[in-house]
Amino acid sequence: MGDVEKGKKIFVQKCAQCHTVEKGGKHKTGPNLHGLFGRKTGQSPGFSYTDANKNKGITWGEETLMEYLENPKKYIPGTKMIFAGIKKKGERADLIAYLKQATNE
């Protein structure tokens, strides 16, 4: 399992410009991520997803996020997420540890 504090720094540096995590947080360029774990792709209420995201049909969890965050466009071809991904597995684990906590508070 990753380091939550390191993951928070990664989120602030690489994700926060497009995503919020708190309950009731607004959508930005990307959707609010509250309640992410256990939710299917393309299901955050009020966000306009691509058909690719809606039709992927996987449920977000540690393993699916680990694969997705390495290369989002490869995992969901047609996603509008323009982020290139995080190549280092340890950094992805840290980010996922943070997301698991922050999106559930």
From Swiss-Prot:
Any Gene Ontology CC annotation: cytosol
Report any Pfam family annotated for this entry: Cytochrom_C
Instruction: Write out the PTM section of this UniProt entry.
Output: Binds 1 heme c group covalently per subunit.
N-acetylglycine PTM positions read 2
Keywords, comma-separated and alphabetical: Acetylation, Apoptosis, Electron transport, Heme, Iron, Metal-binding, Mitochondrion, Phosphoprotein, Respiratory chain, Transport
Localization terms from the record: Mitochondrion intermembrane space
Q: Which GO terms describe its molecular function?
A: electron transfer activity; heme binding; metal ion binding
Residues with PTM N6-acetyllysine: 73, 100
Residues with Phosphotyrosine modification: 49, 98
* Positions with a binding annotation for heme c: 15, 18-19, 81
Any single biological process term in GO = apoptotic process
Q: Mind telling me which InterPro entries this protein's record contains?
A: Cyt_c-like_dom, Cyt_c-like_dom_sf, Cyt_c_1A/1B
Question: Where on the chain is N6-succinyllysine found, per UniProt?
Answer: 56, 73
- Give the protein's biological function: Electron carrier protein. The oxidized form of the cytochrome c heme group can accept an electron from the heme group of the cytochrome c1 subunit of cytochrome reductase. Cytochrome c then transfers this electron to the cytochrome oxidase complex, the final protein carrier in the mitochondrial electron-transport chain.
Q: Hey, which family's this protein in?
A: Belongs to the cytochrome c family.
What PANTHER family does the entry give? CYTOCHROME C
Name the chain's protein. Answer: Cytochrome c
| Origin species | Hippopotamus amphibius
Gene that specifies this protein: CYCS
